[in-house]
Curated annotation (Swiss-Prot):
PROSITE patterns attached to this UniProt entry: KRAB, ZINC_FINGER_C2H2_1, ZINC_FINGER_C2H2_2
Principal location listed in the UniProt entry: nucleus
InterPro entries per the UniProt record, alphabetical: KRAB, KRAB_dom_sf, Znf_C2H2_sf, Znf_C2H2_type
Role description: May be involved in transcriptional regulation.
Region (Disordered): 71-95, 113-162
Family: Belongs to the krueppel C2H2-type zinc-finger protein family.
Cellular location(s): Nucleus
Protein name, entry field: Zinc finger protein 805
GO BP field: regulation of transcription by RNA polymerase II
GO molecular function annotations of the record: DNA-binding transcription factor activity, RNA polymerase II-specific; RNA polymerase II cis-regulatory region sequence-specific DNA binding; zinc ion binding
Length: 627
């Protein structure tokens, strides 16, 4: 090493060697966050050179970065002039300012080593191929000198690559290790830009056949396929494929948030995050869908939305083959196979597969509902629920069923509806084998086996297996009946009660028996009717073993064993309850006046005389439960 330092034939590493370059096509493939990160890193490199006392030029790249412009130049501009500041000047054989700046001014790593060793000679001897082995070694002290400033380290299996250094040192190391030549801005008419090096060599990825013009770019790209992540965080052990990702990640541990919003004071650890946040204040939505015209604030949301039109689902589960549009959805799904429940509630000990589920659950303990609807003031525990609710006000229903044309405001509702047409019942109970179309119904059914009733009324302590029953029950205490019929003014405490009632006025009978075609107003009537076709008799008399299709028929039959009269003398003059036998509609129509009965014996005679007619009308006429 000492011999290398005293060799008079030396070469300095130029700024072009530590600069990441993009073609116009490559630049177009970067999103806004990646472009912003690129600008920040390159300007940070320049600032580092200045802080070390190194002369830094202001070529076209730096000028574009400082002004937020794209860091590529048109070929027409390159063929006319050359370096910035030379416009209008005749060609000369003398080196230009740009040439001197690039070839002589930036000897960053040479000067960095000089400052550490005190040696006045810079650079390394250059062999016929452009680099010697000693030159690679010559850069090592410069890399090692940055070691203390970095938050991470190299994974042991990648020790040969050196330490996880700053962005500058990493770029230089890539170039030296991969054998790229050092380029200087050495001519005006060559048509080569110091930013875009149009090299004859083309490097192709064997996995995906993507083409790169530099070997280091290919090597960095190949990490995607190989999964190599040489940069490891010393705090949590997480690994990254690039040193820049490690630097960004380290701010999670330090809590550093240097980028502050001037509008609301919110701080961020990345400038790209601040830029995205500022669009909330400005209302800017630069990403517009060409299919439906919908605009988005963030590119990632825009890309995800586009997949709803194309149907693309790039994330496929290796276990079951199910595909997903986005990575978070895939990760959430994969936990189903692993059976892992890593998130535990400290209040009740309940465990969850996802952090979002835990946070949502914890709000049941705190009662916090931070997301409020600006239209109606209704509050929600999570933002997704608010977004889900807000569609009610807009009336938008973009998801239409191709089978029947019915439209829905959420994709999940459409998928759930389509199971009616397909007959799919993916949720099967392991206890009794019963299958269900919807997950919510399946969970509710399982509580019938376990006896779990997690929803408790604070007024009376009564518990329920589902939230809907608790809400319906609570209206008993409040007496509230917000749903009023516009036809007759009758009020109900449930929307479903109003809907069922309105069918009396409209005559609608949406429930049809597939066996005989008979229609009914309510689903309960259809279920009760279906037993006629199936012959099912689930209600059995414990005395004689006789079975009945309805509980009311069993109750009526059991009076034959008990000898209890349908109406006793003491019952006359007060309303009937659900536990008592109701007065038959046939008897009311025939004008039988039970209020004139004076003895219990007379009632028994009345019952015997109408026993036959009761059986005739029992199947066709409903019974009045109260008068």
């Amino acid at each position: 090493m000492a011999m290398a330092l005293t060799d008079p034939a030396q070469v300095s590493v130029t700024f072009d060697d530590v600069a990441v370059t993009f073609t116009q096509e490559e630049w177009g493939q970067l999103d806004l966050a990646q472009r912003t990160l690129y600008q920040e890193v390159m300007l940070e490199n320049c600032g580092l050179l200045v802080s070390l006392g190194c002369p830094v030029p202001r070529p076209e790249l730096i000028y574009h970065l400082e002004h937020g412009q794209e860091p590529w130049t048109r070929k027409e501009d390159l063929s006319q002039g050359t370096c910035p500041g030379d416009k209008g000047k005749p060609k000369s054989t003398e080196p230009t300012t740009c040439e001197l700046a690039l070839s002589e001014g930036i000897s960053f790593w040479g000067q960095l080593t000089q400052g550490a060793s005190g040696d006045s000679q810079l650079g390394q001897p250059k062999d016929q191929d452009g680099f010697s082995e000693m030159q690679g070694e010559r850069l090592r002290p410069g890399l090692d000198s940055q070691k203390e400033k970095l938050p991470g380290k190299m994974s042991p299996k990648h020790d040969g690559l050196g330490t996880a250094d700053s962005v500058c040192s990493r770029i230089i190391q890539d170039r030296v290790s991969l054998g790229d030549d050092v380029h200087d801005c050495d001519s005006h008419g060559s048509g080569k830009n110091p930013v875009i090096q149009e090299e004859e060599n083309i490097f192709k990825c064997n996995e995906c056949e993507k083409v790169f013009n530099k070997k280091r770019l290919l090597a960095r790209h190949e990490r995607i396929h190989s999964g190599v992540k040489p940069y490891e965080c010393t705090e949590c052990g997480k690994t990254f494929s690039k040193s820049t990702y490690l630097l960004q990640h380290h701010m999670v541990h330090t809590g550093e948030k240097p980028y502050k919003c001037m509008e609301c004071g919110k701080a961020f650890n990345r400038k790209s995050h601040l830029t995205q946040h500022q669009r909330i204040h400005s209302g800017e939505k630069p990403y517009k869908c060409s299919e439906c015209g919908k605009a988005f604030t963030h590119r990632s949301t825009f890309v995800l939305h586009n997949r709803s039109h194309t149907g693309e689902k790039p994330f496929v589960c290796k276990e079951c083959g199910k595909a997903f549009r986005d990575r978070p959805g895939f990760i959430r799904h994969y936990i189903i196979h692993s059976g892992e429940n890593p998130y535990e509630c400290f209040e009740c000990g309940k465990v969850f597969k996802h952090r979002s589920y835990l946070m949502w659950h914890q709000q049941t303990h705190t009662g916090e509902k931070p997301y409020e609807c600006s239209e109606c003031g209704k509050a929600f525990c999570e933002s997704a629920a608010l977004i889900h609710h807000y569609v009610i006000h807009t009336g938008e229903k973009p998801f239409e069923c191709l089978e029947c044309g019915k439209a829905f405001n959420h994709r999940s509702y459409l998928k759930r509806h389509q199971r009616i047409h397909t007959g799919e019942k993916p949720y099967v109970c392991s206890e009794c084998g019963k299958a269900f179309t919807h997950c919510s119904t399946f969970i509710l059914h399982k509580r019938a086996h376990t006896g779990e009733k997690p929803f408790e009324c604070k007024e009376c302590g009564k518990a329920f297996s589902n939230r809907a029953d608790l809400i319906r029950h609570f209206s008993i205490h409040t007496g509230e009946k917000p749903y009023e019929c516009m036809e007759c003014g009758k009020a109900f405490n449930r929307r479903s009660g109003l809907t069922r009632h309105q069918r009396i006025h409209s005559g609608e009978k949406p429930y049809e028996c597939i066996e005989c075609g008979k229609t009914f107003c309510w689903s309960t009537n259809l279920i009760r009717h279906s037993i006629i076709h199936t012959g099912e008799k689930p209600y059995e008399c414990s005395e004689c073993g006789k079975a009945f299709s309805r509980s009311s028929s069993l109750t009526q039959h059991q009076r034959m064993h008990t000898g209890r009269n349908p109406i006793s003398v003491t019952d006359v003059g007060r309303p009937f309850t659900s536990g008592q036998t109701s007065v038959n509609i046939q008897e009311l129509l025939l004008g039988k006046n039970f209020l004139n009965v004076t003895t219990e014996e007379n009632l028994l005679q009345e019952e015997a005389s109408y026993m036959a007619s009761d059986r005739t009308y029992q199947r066709e006429t409903p019974q009045v439960s109260s008068l």
